[in-house]
Amino acid sequence: MASSGGELGSLFDHHVQRAVCDTRAKYREGRRPRAVKVYTINLESQYLLIQGVPAVGVMKELVERFALYGAIEQYNALDEYPAEDFTEVYLIKFMNLQSARTAKRKMDEQSFFGGLLHVCYAPEFETVEETRKKLQMRKAYVVKTTENKDHYVTKKKLVTEHKDTEDFRQDFHSEMSGFCKAALNTSAGNSNPYLPYSCELPLCYFSSKCMCSSGGPVDRAPDSSKDGRNHHKTMGHYNHNDSLRKTQINSLKNSVACPGAQKAITSSEAVDRFMPRTTQLQERKRRREDDRKLGTFLQTNPTGNEIMIGPLLPDISKVDMHDDSLNTTANLIRHKLKEVISSVPKPPEDKPEDVHTSHPLKQRRRI
């Protein structure tokens, strides 16, 4: 692994900066050319090795610059590490691994006091306990991520199944209502009130019909061939069957109407509970418009069946002349005045726009 003896503080292969990758796809190229290298958890470390630092006593500034990306636990200069002339090498240990990742990504190949820094991981400085802790943290992170992903996938499947079930129920209810309506229309138009099996009526309907009719369609043929001995009994069966059919049709209509009412109630409750703000505003606006239209209709309604709201205004008092002839003359004068007032045309109201058009303004001179 090591190129110079493999001792601690010497130059390792993973410390050497790699060349720029020229075979990288165009859509994967960044703002500046980079080398391509994959880091696993055993190659990453809290220890960072900084090479290319100018030897002008800038250790304090270097530590302050790296402290921007996380808490630093310790730092020191590596005097025995092979370096270029007039440069120094420093070792910095961060408190957590994520801070070290960020600092390496941000500070690698950055200009610092005239020099170009090269930052790399130094896992060879880790102790056995630090390595064990690093691997355990990585394992816990992987377990947590996979659990969240599995939970999300399971939740998504449950939501999809619930949605499919609701769609199936809605389709089923719509088909049932359509079938039952068609059956009711057919039975109302025909003389025979028997309903088709496509209405999906409960089995008790047909069983009760067969039991109560006492074998009507099948047993009536031999009875009718017995020279009219059971004529009164057969007529009684017919009347009983007719009344039974009417009762069944009424009960079916009620049963068909009930699901629709329940569904309407459920939908109204859902709307009241989950109505958005925009929908509420639109509903209020619609109600105001309906009230305004109703008020306009009541005002312009020519019929006498007007809805009066509030107390009636007092009528105009009529002057009594204490003489029939004088009262007749006064009524004639009042009617004549009303006719004259109604026949006089109203003068047209001159709008300010008409005034402006009749008297055009003088055009301003352009200077």
UniProtKB/Swiss-Prot annotation:
GO BP annotations, alphabetical order: mRNA processing; RNA splicing
Gene Ontology terms for molecular function: RNA binding
SUPFAM superfamilies: RNA-binding domain, RBD
Domain RRM: from-to ranges: 46-124
Region Disordered, annotated ranges: 217-243, 280-302, 343-367
Keyword RNA-binding belongs to the record: yes
Transmembrane segments: none
Xref: InterPro entries: RBD_domain_sf (IPR035979), RBM48 (IPR039599), RBM48_RRM (IPR034264)
Keyword Flavoprotein in record: no
Cellular-component GO terms for this entry: nucleoplasm; spliceosomal complex
Subunit structure of this chain's protein: Component of the minor spliceosome. Within this complex, interacts with ARMC7 and PRPF8/PRP8.
Function: As a component of the minor spliceosome, involved in the splicing of U12-type introns in pre-mRNAs.
Similarity annotation: Belongs to the RBM48 family.
Protein name in the entry: RNA-binding protein 48
Organism whose genome encodes this protein: Homo sapiens
